[in-house]
Amino acid sequence: IEGYSHWNTCPSGGDNKSTAEDFDFVETLIDRIDDTYNLNSERIYAAGYSNGGMMAYGLAHYKSDLIAAIGSVSGAMLDCYGSIAHPMPVVLLHGTQDDVLPYDGNTELASVQTTLDYWINFNNTSTSPSVTTDNSGPLSVQHSVYSGGVNGVSVEHYRYQEGGHVWFDATYQGQNASELVWNFVSRYDINGLR
């Protein structure tokens, strides 16, 4: 992301590509929008694609007092962890053939399974998911649900077999990535399952 628009997904320093304080920017943005539109502060969500997915993970760690649930599409969680204020519902959508942020990780990035394990442990969900598969579209999509977490929180994963580094148009039971993320996060508020 050197030279491109990006989010700094960890606190200042480390691997950040600029000195922008993006966590503070998001908090200020939420405050300004709330001043105009009177937001429901218990139902603010973070979701993003690629580096935006990384930012969602960062917001979960460093601004969890503002964020009720997160979604990451083709994103990776970096190894900078903050103090999370409440159980955090998380949905991950990732393709097995992602050549930018590899599904199985690499020497610099955690694998999808490592990320799932982190959130499963943090939220104290079941470690044995319920799994369903939809083979009706151009990509086979496997949906794993780790339920029963603190405050009704779950961790969910959509695994797009042969999927690349994209915001997925391929559907799971008729829902595209945008719908899957929204239908997941909107079940929660800052206190857990609504």
Q: Residue locations for each model-derived region?
A:
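Alpha/beta-hydrolase-fold serine-hydrolase catalytic core, especially in secreted/extracellular enzymes
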Residues: 88, 117-194
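Serine-hydrolase catalytic machinery in alpha/beta-hydrolase-like enzymes
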Residues: 1-45, 55-58, 62, 169-171
